[in-house]
Curated annotation (Swiss-Prot):
Lineage of producing organism: Bacteria, Pseudomonadati, Pseudomonadota, Alphaproteobacteria, Hyphomicrobiales
Keywords: RNA-binding, Transcription, Transcription antitermination, Transcription regulation
Gene name of the encoded protein: nusB
Cited NCBIfam families: nusB
Designated name of the protein: Transcription antitermination protein NusB
Cited function: Involved in transcription antitermination. Required for transcription of ribosomal RNA (rRNA) genes. Binds specifically to the boxA antiterminator sequence of the ribosomal RNA (rrn) operons.
Native species: Sinorhizobium medicae (strain WSM419)
Length: 160
């Protein structure tokens, strides 16, 4: 039996967690719609982070954390994508992945590389939870496995 999002218990989200979720959404929007980084960051800060939009209230998020992830992924994408590609199974290309999964993996990989002050288990868990918000089956497992492989390669550690 699969759970719909309304069947799952709500977890309290911290401001960094909300920033990560917003960053994944922004990266997805940039990937699919071709929106530029300055435009997307301004849109999220002015209309989404902690704001009400179309009857939905967005979570309060750490705006500087959000900006750091989005700008960092865009800046470092040529470094991130090969790392992600090498952590995928041999017969999978990054381009074959769903745009949301790509956004999650890019953001998680960026944090593993650049945010040495954040423990790997925190990063991996946060992005697996984001994957679970969008997918119910294999995608969260894929996110977990790929980010674990990248963490081991980059930091020499795995999620415990």
């Amino acid at each position: 039996m699969t759970n719909t999002p309304s069947d799952q218990p709500l977890k309290q989200v911290n401001q960094r967690g909300a920033a990560r979720l917003a960053a994944v959404q922004a990266l997805y929007q940039m990937d699919v719609g071709g929106t530029g980084v300055l435009e997307i960051v301004a849109e999220y800060e002015e209309h989404r982070l902690g704001k009400e939009l179309d009857g939905d209230t967005y979570l309060r998020a750490d705006a500087s954390w959000f900006r750091s992830i989005v700008a960092g992924v865009v800046r470092d994408q040529r470094k991130l994508d090969p790392l992600i590609g090498s952590a995928l199974q041999d017969d999978w290309a990054l381009s074959r992945l769903d745009s949301t999964v790509r956004a999650i993996l890019r953001a998680g990989t960026f944090e593993i590389l650049e945010r040495k002050d954040v423990p790997v288990p925190v990063i991996v868990t946060e992005y697996v939870e984001i994957a679970k918000a969008f997918f119910q089956d294999e995608e969260p497992k894929l996110v977990n496995a790929v980010l674990d492989r990248i963490a081991k390669q980059v930091r020499g550690e795995q999620r415990k």
